């Protein structure tokens, strides 16, 4: 699913919004966004 795609891109899933210093890189599920840390 999309969740494993997120982890493969070294991202993580966050509820509704991504924490600061991260970028939205997709969706994990209906309410969870895939977030990626800014390096």
Curated annotation (Swiss-Prot):
Coiled coil: none
A Gene Ontology term for the protein's cellular component: extracellular region
UniProt protein name: Antimicrobial peptide CHP1
Matching Pfam families: Defensin_beta
Keyword line: Antibiotic, Antimicrobial, Disulfide bond
SS bond partners: 6-28, 13-34, 18-35
Function text: Bactericidal activity; inhibits S.aureus and E.coli.
GO biological process, alphabetically ordered: defense response to bacterium
């Amino acid at each position: 699913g999309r969740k494993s795609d997120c982890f493969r891109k070294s991202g993580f899933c966050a509820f509704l919004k991504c924490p600061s210093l991260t970028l939205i890189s997709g969706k994990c599920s209906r309410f969870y966004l895939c977030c990626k840390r800014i390096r």
